[in-house]
Amino acid sequence: ALKGNPQSVLSCIEGFVQDGHRRWLKIAGGPKAHVIDAATSTRPLSAHEIGIEMGCFVGYTAIRLGWRLGGQGLWGASMRAGVLSTELEAVHICIARHHIDGAQLSCAAEVWPGHIPWTTPRYIEQFGSYGAGFIFMDHKGTRFHDDLGDCSALRLLAPWSRLLCDNVLKPGAPKHLWMHHRAPLCHRSAVVLSLHEFLEPGVEDWQSLRDEAPPQVPQGAAGPGSGAAGRRARALPPAHGPEHSA
């Protein structure tokens, strides 16, 4: 791979998978990579947001996300990451960091060691509430709904943040699909995409995509229309709906 060239590093990882004796390396390439690129291009990070990946493996998608989103978000083009990936396995962490270094994207993507339920509160501690503009889940489908619930409870999700989940058919994320992608519970932006696995056209898998609507203010609660904050809000130009949509 050409050092400092993200596409070259990604192609090198894909070439490793193309070897018939090494199919064990499962990455979100091919049509899944196209979905990731489209999802990030239509929902860029704003100035105060970060991107999060849950489940890094060998760093393939972390490179793609850092390449697409790392120049945006909380620190712009500074030397601090705009995309943070969490991985539990120590060997995978070393490999992923090596690949990210090879793409020279260490300033855009960072790999954190740890168990995701224990790491999620750290995002709030370091970046504050409503700071996650994009989340990619690719760790354990039976935990997607729990980890999304943790993010919501901790107020991590920015208004209209985008959630993209991989492998929701195989191995599967049935409870996540039942809770967030069935009427009448699903938001109008929620879709499930049927794709084939990278280099395996006969193997179907799904990716789920949804945008998180802003939290609703309880009826009767003091909202932005009350007090000095409300007077300041009324002095601002009217909003024109969400900045991003699916």
Predicted segments with their positions:
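Short, well-ordered secondary-structure micro-motifs
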Residues: R64, I95-H98, P121-I124, D147-L148, ...
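Short, hinge-like loop/turn segments at secondary-structure boundaries
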Residues: R43, D101-Q104, F127-Y130, H181-A183
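C-terminal substrate-binding/active-site "lid" region of AdoMet-derived donor-dependent transferases
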Residues: R143-A246
